[in-house]
Amino acid sequence: SSAASDVYKRQHLYNAMSPLHHREPGIVGAALAHAKYAELIPDLLHVHPGAMRVALRSIPCLYCVTDSTAAAGMPDGEYKLGSHTVTKCLGGVRLADGTLAGSTLTMDQALRNLVKIGLPISEASQRLSQFPADYLGLEERGRLQPGSFADCVRMDRSLTLTDVMVEGETIDFKNA
């Protein structure tokens, strides 16, 4: 049904979905076979790098999101996530039963992770900016071209954030 086929457009691919099985491919199989767009959390905890590569090769406009919680950038410890208490430890955020509950992923780390699993930096950047903007119908965002919003970042050779520009103006993100 079209309702079932739209699920992978509104859900992090692989997460809270039955695993891919050769006799019952489920939503993951439908996305891999038919989707133009789907989203994935590239924190290397939610999805194994091998499964990420399968999705990246199968879904032309697979885009990546952080799914970050308030624990991102904070030390390990307990944090609130809605009505839940979650624990940040070893880069992950988990409920008391061990279930992943969001992430601590930042966009710059997402870029480094995508490059680490073999994507060229240009494709990794596109999957973090242009493809999500396109999915949302925001063609004036997610790309550097005349008429687009000039929101961008500059990184050094190690892909560490050095500058942030919002509407074409450099901002002091280190003291924000």
Regions found by a protein language model. Name each.
Residues 19-20, 47-50, 71-76:
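Short acidic/glycine-rich loop or secondary-structure boundary segments that cap or lie
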